[in-house]
């Protein structure tokens, strides 16, 4: 889930990830929950950031457990971040320039084998 606000995107460092390793937020859909509501709930649970508009971006088959990853773009309604400390241990906003600089300095962004990196690259390459 690519959460954005005023030209910045919200990325997180998940428990067990190396310092400087950021990725988009992710989660699961609950029983009888819409995909859009799942995005809003997961972002709020992991970062405390409320989300408004949610837009589909892309999907990817995922082998475990015979699942699918669905990429969404979401608009944050606030900037203040409060990480849950369980799944997410750090989260911060990045401008496109900061994200490109982070990646150039060997900072890790997303997983090469997942939709996560596709979503980030798509956002980085958009004209501003």
Question: Which residue stretches match the model-derived regions?
Answer:
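Hydrophobic alpha-helical positions that pack around
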Residues: 25, 39, 43
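Active-site-adjacent beta-strand/loop module that shapes the phosphate/pyrophosphate-binding cleft
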Residues: 60-83
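A broad structural signal for short, well-ordered beta-strand segments within beta-sheet-rich domains
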Residues: 51, 68, 76, 88-90
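Nudix hydrolase/Nudix homology domain
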Residues: 18-22, 84-128
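N-terminal strand-loop-strand
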Residues: 1-24, 28-29, 50-55, 74-76
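Glycine-rich phosphate/ribose-binding loops and adjacent secondary-structure elements
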Residues: 31-35
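Hydrophobic/anchoring residues in structured secondary elements
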Residues: 56-59, 93
